[in-house]
């Protein structure tokens, strides 16, 4: 049906060009909001009526007659109706819709994929400080980043997944000091445990039980191995640097386990500390100074960021000689650009919104050829977790927050991914643990996965009865697929490639979750309306081809989300 649609669009473009030279680009179809209005809607007559000084409905009648005379419309279209002020409602023949079944079965796992576009994109996400286990907010970011990467892959991009490791900030000192105190036998609540002098009730060190675990392993002189490092503790509570390196390696290992539980893999871990040791931060600051985009005031070095759209100038280097946190960010993004990534997408929490203008200002001021608006940002809100009708704020591992691994252990990797992707990133989301484990239609991931498993059960029953395999269904006669539920299901299948393209362009994986729920609903309606394993062999094989194509698209869509498509449930 995708090829059918292209044929019809080409015919429409040709007729529009005849009516008004230069108007071929207006050739487009919309999906009617009401199924009774047809399969495609065209508004070209209303768009051209004013410049052509014609009545839109009369122009619609003229266009209708011209389209009906084309070979493509004669072959694939059952009827064209004029509605309202000039809408063209197009109703396809059953044979046109049946083509989508062949297209899906022929393309298989590649259905919905576009050709290689020869371009590279870097997506940076999670990028957590190595100071504790990944929390649920990191989980939302992980699900978003991975799904957006998968969407880009479907559109022909070469995708690079990157984790920026913040191993050079003040949080690392806090982690080290917290571990050192635990190693010395102290714990939160003791008089010596540091507090914020401006807010004595607030403990400024990390209090989770995982800090005691780090201290215990440090004293035991254990070796920890993470994705990018291995380190052995010496057990000396006075050796601050050794504690620091061990604690960072330990938590790198813990975060690796979190990511593995989420089935998430990165192409590169980029260390913030490397920006300092390589001289990139200093070189970036020097370039901004040389370009005349800085000034000194009150002992600090400032960037003239208001020259580039920021609401105020920003301090780059403080009085004590240390850099503010956006400076290494600017250096890091220059490095991304120099590595050949003309498109970069950063997935971050909405609390980072304030850094966008200053980072982009720094990149423009550096004058290295980076375009305005670089990089792209996808911002997400945090996640509220509810269990048993009550909000859960404390998990077993971190002590002060629910971790990603807590959520996976309470539910499943698939439920966490699907649920965290089921809303727009910038909308508040409440994760209902009880709903995520429910085996009913209210649970969206269960509903979609059950549709796939239900189809696989039918295909197994057919194969076990000596029917054959899915490959044998590619060229069957599909003329029996004429019922309303079958046609609705085929139309839903045909929407998948365009949905993927729109979701990739909008960096909106929630669109995939909406689509899959609609597809599952269409399948369940079809299954309830028509028996599949009937006695009539031709009808049976046609229906099997349709459900096999449906299973394929469910599988493909779930894969984009990083969710399994089970054969049994």
Swiss-Prot record:
Q: Does the keyword Protein biosynthesis apply?
A: yes
Q: Which residues form a coiled coil?
A: none
Gene3D superfamilies per UniProt: Arginyl tRNA synthetase N-terminal domain, HUPs, Isoleucyl-tRNA Synthetase, Domain 1
PROSITE patterns under this entry? AA_TRNA_LIGASE_I
Q: Where is this motif: 'HIGH' region?
A: 128-138
Any Pfam family from its record, for instance, is Arg_tRNA_synt_N
Swiss-Prot/TrEMBL catalytic activity: tRNA(Arg) + L-arginine + ATP = L-arginyl-tRNA(Arg) + AMP + diphosphate
What is a single molecular function from GO for this protein?
arginine-tRNA ligase activity
Q: Where in the cell is it found?
A: Cytoplasm
EC primary class: ligase
Q: Which GO terms describe its cellular component?
A: cytoplasm
SUBUNIT field: Monomer.
- List the NCBIfam families hit by this protein, alphabetically: argS (TIGR00456)
Q: Which family does it belong to?
A: Belongs to the class-I aminoacyl-tRNA synthetase family.
Give the protein's recorded name: Arginine--tRNA ligase
Gene (name only): argS
């Amino acid at each position: 049906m995708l090829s059918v649609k292209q044929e019809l669009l080409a015919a429409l473009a040709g007729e529009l060009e005849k009516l008004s030279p230069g108007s071929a680009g207006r050739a487009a179809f919309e999906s009617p909001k009401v199924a009774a209005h047809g399969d495609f809607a065209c508004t070209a007559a209303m768009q051209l009526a004013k410049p052509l000084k014609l009545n839109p409905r009369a122009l619609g009648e003229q266009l209708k007659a011209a389209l009906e005379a084309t070979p493509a419309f004669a072959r694939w279209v059952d009827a064209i109706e004029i509605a309202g002020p000039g809408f063209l409602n197009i109703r396809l023949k059953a044979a046109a819709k049946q083509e989508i079944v062949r297209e899906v079965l022929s393309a298989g796992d590649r259905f919905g994929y576009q050709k290689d576009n020869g371009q590279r994109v870097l997506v940076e996400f999670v990028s957590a400080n190595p100071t504790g286990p990944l929390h649920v907010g990191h989980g939302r970011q992980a699900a978003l980043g991975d799904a957006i990467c998968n969407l880009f892959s479907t559109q022909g991009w070469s995708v690079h997944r990157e984790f920026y490791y913040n191993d050079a900030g003040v949080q690392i000192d806090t982690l080290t000091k917290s571990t050192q105190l635990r190693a010395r036998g102290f714990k939160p609540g003791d008089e010596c445990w540091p507090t914020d002098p401006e807010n004595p009730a607030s403990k400024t060190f990390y209090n989770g039980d995982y800090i005691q675990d780090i201290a215990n392993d440090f004293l035991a002189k254990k070796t920890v191995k993470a994705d990018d490092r291995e380190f052995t503790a010496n057990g000396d509570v006075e050796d601050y640097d050794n504690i620091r390196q061990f604690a960072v390696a330990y938590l790198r290992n813990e975060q690796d386990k979190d990511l593995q539980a989420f089935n998430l893999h990165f192409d590169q871990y980029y260390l913030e500390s490397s920006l300092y040791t390589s001289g990139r931060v200093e070189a970036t600051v020097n370039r901004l100074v040389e370009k005349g985009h800085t000034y000194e005031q009150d002992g600090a070095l400032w960037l003239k960021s208001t020259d580039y759209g920021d609401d105020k100038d920003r301090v780059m280097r403080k009085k004590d000689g240390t850099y503010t946190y956006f400076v290494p960010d600017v250096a890091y993004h220059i490095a991304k650009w120099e590595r050949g990534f003309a498109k970069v997408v950063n997935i971050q929490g909405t609390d980072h919104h304030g850094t966008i203008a200053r980072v982009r200002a720094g990149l423009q001021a550096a004058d290295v050829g980076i375009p305005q608006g670089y990089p792209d940002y996808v911002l997400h809100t945090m996640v509220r977790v509810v269990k048993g009708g009550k909000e859960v704020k404390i998990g077993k591992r971190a002590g002060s927050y629910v971790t990603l691994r807590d959520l996976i252990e309470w539910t499943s990797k698939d439920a966490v991914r699907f649920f965290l992707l089921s809303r727009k990133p910038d909308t508040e989301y409440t994760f209902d643990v009880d709903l995520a484990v429910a085996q009913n239609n209210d649970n969206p991931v269960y509903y979609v996965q059950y549709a796939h498993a239900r189809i696989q059960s039918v295909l197994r029953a057919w194969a076990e009865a000596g029917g054959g395999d899915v490959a044998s269904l590619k060229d069957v006669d599909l003329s029996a697929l004429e019922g309303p539920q079958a046609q609705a299901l085929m139309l839903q299948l045909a929407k998948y490639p365009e949905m993927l393209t729109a979701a990739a362009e909008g960096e909106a994986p929630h669109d995939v979750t909406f689509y899959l729920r609609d597809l599952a609903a269409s399948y369940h309606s079809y299954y309830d309306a028509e028996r599949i394993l009937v006695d009539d062999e031709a009808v049976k094989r046609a229906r099997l081809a349709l459900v096999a194509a449906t299973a394929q698209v469910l599988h493909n869509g779930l894969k984009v989300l990083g969710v399994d498509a089970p054969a049994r449930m």
